[in-house]
Curated annotation (Swiss-Prot):
The gene is ptpA. It comes from Staphylococcus aureus (strain bovine RF122 / ET3-1). This is Low molecular weight protein-tyrosine-phosphatase PtpA. Belongs to the low molecular weight phosphotyrosine protein phosphatase family. The keyword Hydrolase applies. Keywords: Hydrolase, Phosphoprotein, Protein phosphatase, Secreted. PANTHER family: LOW MOLECULAR WEIGHT PHOSPHOTYROSINE PROTEIN PHOSPHATASE (PTHR11717:SF7), LOW MOLECULAR WEIGHT PROTEIN TYROSINE PHOSPHATASE (PTHR11717). The keyword Secreted applies.
Amino acid sequence: MVDVAFVCLGNICRSPMAEAIMRQRLKDRNIHDIKVHSRGTGSWNLGEPPHEGTQKILNKHNIPFDGMISELFEATDDFDYIVAMDQSNVDNIKFINPNLKGQLFKLLEFSNMEESDVPDPYYTNNFEGVYDMVLSSCDNLIDYIVKDANLKEG
């Protein structure tokens, strides 16, 4: 079993959206050896459910997010793969845990998009655009993890 964590600032918009989408894609692909989490690098939303914009877009696409609440990325977290939404969160992750053992990426490294950072829809209100960015990256990320961790699909 490998652990993957998506990380954004408050863990109410981008990273829970990515967690829910990734879980759905893993289910669709019948992959059971990847456990998905999400975390935030800021503590002001701890214990809150996903933002209503995130909930709305996930509901629109019939992707479950039951029981998800905001959690903080901590130095003691031990994930195999850490996937940040933007460079600011990469920097925050390295500051919180300068001795990371897991592999650290930005999500859009797994997309075919020119952008390198997933913009925060908390400020832009573009939840649909963020959904498209996350969805376009998840299968390539899954492919990478399956190969890197020598997992079986199906």
